[in-house]
């Protein structure tokens, strides 16, 4: 396989390029969903939490965004490889959310990868286990590990299949 070439967004035109090119393209290939992490947590020996309701009645579920490389290739963006290479699952940092990774998602799509971003418990639109929306709390860090592994083995694997 030859070397991949992906052109970075020109910093002098960054805001304009993100607004006029990147975000509209991402919108066309984005799929939003909800992941029920209870099976993954039980499998890891962790009792599932119900989560405090805050979005659409999805008790305990985790929000995610996935970007399909086939749909991206169909819009024929300049610089896209149009060669499916697999899927990438992004695990965001503490107090972050999926959309923070829009630019990175763009580069992976250009390179031929589908991308999935799980919003961990207590982050973004995912279930929270405290009333204070400004506070990120988790009872056991292994819950994050179990949730991400379960997500990668199900949703991520679907996108990796192409």
List the predicted regions and their residue ranges:
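An N-terminal hydrophobic leader/cap segment in hydrolases
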Residues: 1-56, 63-70, 74-80
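Well-ordered alpha-helical segments embedded in enzymatic catalytic cores
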Residues: 63, 93, 100, 147-151
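Glycine-rich phosphate-binding loop signature in dinucleotide/nucleotide-binding domains
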Residues: 81-83, 155-162
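Active-site glycine-rich loops that stabilize anionic/oxyanionic intermediates
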Residues: 85-96
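Conserved alpha/beta-hydrolase
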Residues: 98, 103-131
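Alpha/beta-hydrolase active-site loop
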Residues: 136-158
């Amino acid at each position: 396989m030859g070397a991949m070439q992906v052109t970075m967004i020109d910093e002098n035109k960054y805001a304009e390029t993100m607004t006029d090119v990147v975000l509209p393209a991402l919108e066309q290939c984005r799929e939003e969903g909800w992941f029920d992490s209870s099976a993954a947590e039980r499998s890891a020996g962790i009792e599932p939490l119900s989560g405090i309701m805050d979005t659409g009645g999805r008790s305990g579920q985790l929000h995610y965004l996935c970007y399909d490389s086939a749909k991206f290739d169909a819009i024929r963006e300049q610089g896209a490889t149009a060669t499916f290479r697999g899927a990438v699952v992004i695990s965001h940092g503490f107090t972050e959310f999926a959309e923070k990774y829009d630019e990175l998602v763009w580069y992976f799509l250009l390179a031929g990868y589908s991308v999935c971003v799980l919003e961990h418990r207590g982050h973004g639109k995912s279930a929270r286990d405290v009333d204070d929306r400004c506070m990120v709390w988790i009872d056991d860090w292994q819950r994050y590990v179990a949730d991400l592994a379960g997500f990668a083995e199900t949703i991520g694997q679907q996108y990796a299949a192409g």
